[in-house]
A protein has these predicted regions:
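N-terminal secretory signal peptides that target proteins for export/translocation
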Residues: 1-2
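Small beta-barrel nucleic-acid-binding modules, primarily SNase/OB-fold domains
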Residues: 5-7, 15-115
Length: 115
């Protein structure tokens, strides 16, 4: 009987481990028009948007647009492209979209593609 309860307990724990909610990376802060602070509940990353170049005169408008597109706690997928001076360079795709935020940025006329 004791072995039966042990097996049931192992089964319940296994079920909870395998079917628990997966936490994704999320936006913590828009630092500038091309730099974001992203966290995944135990680490934070400074991430630069890949393939973007923003002119200085559009900086303020670009930051506002980026904050509207990626508000705090927005879940995102990262596609790393490399790193520079300890900063991750990545494409960022919001969960509610299949389009990279860089493509949207360029389509809005706020950035140019430098890849």
């Amino acid at each position: 009987m004791n072995k039966f309860f042990t097996n049931i307990l192992i089964l319940v724990i296994s079920f909870l481990c395998f079917y628990s909610k997966v936490d994704a990376a999320e936006i913590l802060q828009v630092t500038s028009s091309s730099v974001l602070l992203i966290g995944d509940h135990n680490r934070t990353y400074t991430v630069k948007l890949a393939c973007t170049e923003i002119s200085p005169e559009l900086e303020e408008k670009s930051v506002g647009w980026l904050k509207r597109q990626l508000p705090r706690h927005t879940k995102v997928n990262l596609k790393p492209q490399g790193s520079l001076d300890g900063m991750l360079i990545a494409k960022i795709i919001p969960f509610n979209s299949k389009i990279d935020i860089t493509e949207k940025y360029i389509n809005e006329g706020l950035a140019t593609n430098n890849c």
